[in-house]
From Swiss-Prot:
Catalysed reactions listed for this entry: alpha-D-glucose 6-phosphate = beta-D-fructose 6-phosphate
Biological pathway: Carbohydrate biosynthesis; gluconeogenesis; Carbohydrate degradation; glycolysis; D-glyceraldehyde 3-phosphate and glycerone phosphate from D-glucose: step 2/4
Gene name tied to this protein: pgi
Descriptive protein name: Glucose-6-phosphate isomerase
Protein family (similarity comment): Belongs to the GPI family.
HAMAP family: G6P_isomerase
EC class name: isomerase
Pfam families associated with the record: PGI
E.C. no: 5.3.1.9
Cellular location(s): Cytoplasm
GO CC aspect terms: cytosol
The organism of origin for this protein: Prochlorococcus marinus (strain MIT 9211)
InterPro entries: G6P_Isomerase (IPR001672), Phosphoglucose_isomerase_CS (IPR018189), SIS_dom_sf (IPR046348), SIS_PGI_2 (IPR035482)
NCBIfam families: PRK14096.1
Amino acid sequence: MNLPDYSPNNSSLQWERFSELLWHNEELGLWVDISRMNVNEHELKELKPIFQKAFEAMNSLEKGSMANIDEERMVGHYWLRNPDLAPSRDISKLIANQISQIEQFTTSILSGDIRSDAGELFTDVLWIGIGGSGLGPLLLIESLQELNKGLKFHFLDNVDPIGIDKKLELLQSKLSTTLFVVVSKSGGTPEPQIAMDQARHVVETNGKNWPTRSVAITMCNSLLDNKAKQENWLKTFDLPDWVGGRTSITGAVGLLPLGLIDSDLKSFLLGASKMDELTRNNELLDNPAALMAMAWYSSGSAKGLKDMVVLPYRDSLEVFSRYLQQLVMESLGKKNDREGNIVFQGLSVYGNKGSTDQHAYVQQLRDGINNFFVTFIEVLTNNESPCLNNKLPGDYLSGFMQGTRLALSDSNRQSLTITLKTFDPLSLGALIALFERTVGLYAELININAYHQPGVEAGKKAAADILNLQLQIEDILSDYSNYSIEQISTRLSSSNSESIYFILRNLVFNNKYSAKGSWKNPSSLIFKREKL
């Protein structure tokens, strides 16, 4: 092989490079082009032995090795789209049975065989889940739901009280025909628990029965699972401990919403499974995920020094950059490598959609700081929009994408391009699986664990500590006496005066306590609990 270096200003050499590096699969109708990433022949040769170790590690993971050492768990999202790969018959049966149950349940909901307790057809879904439990379903709904087909989805993915009130107020007249789906792997994550409690309160204060219109997706024997079974909820689906939230989209977390919008969940699984097969190829240039992982590695000097800007030129993929933010950044953003060395790894991801972004931050991408590479995503097949004034929308969209790609290259800005022949459940499943495998391979190249999230757990613990501190502060103020921040800090033997200030400010402006003094001068403030 004689691969020319990245030569944006030499069209002849760049064409040769493009032809050498282009990957295509006819069955999936998918192309991957890394020719405008700064990968050279020397790196190809140098990375081959490292990639062989990465391929072996991924093979071991798929066979059931303890990939998540921190939690002593296997990592099995690849089994979800091909149950025969699972390391035991019990797991294979569990996956196959769950797919069948989801198909039966969603078909019964849509046909009216399963109705509300008032005998009405379900019309809406309130999906309660955070992180991967919310982003994955949101991506599927925004990407694949057809007009006037299936149930209408609404999402509670935060504990913003105003946001919760707005969603519940919107559903006020539809409570009797709304299906409530609560997703929480452990069953104890505060955000979905709080959102569920708020939704349940509205349902029950309006005289409706919560269990008869509620579905849980959670681990077997979790707090939520036990509650749902004790109260005889409409249905529960299993979220196995070997599936992480950010890779749960081909399990019940993704298949249930697909079924409820009457989309082809089998094709979605097939697309992911087919891409899994293609990305098991140990030949570097014949494996699209390996090509992308190599491009990430080269572009960021193996340290994630360049951000990834995701530009999908299709409205249906507008949520995809947010989905990739979690998949990539939660997986790769690690302080330590596998040996415990401090490495501060990661890959920052942001984006929206083209051609909107051409009128936003593409100006900086072309002429500003060169600290990124772009991932373009295009779809070739368009609908039958009329040709008006000799103009077709799809032609212009494609032209804008190609023009942006060339304009960036002219300024020596790197990009890779993923092209889909059509956009449907099959191609979306393949696209998601492509990025999942790329993340896994890249993590092996930089020697980090992609399947744990100690930073997330640290954030949860810190939040719990703050909430506990608030309880202690409120206990002190319960005697209706005046207290300064310094006095409260002394009573609590706490040096965290800043957090005490933030907590008290929140309490005061939510009409629980009064404050005298200047907010600009925290030491002057005196707080008191008001008698009702």
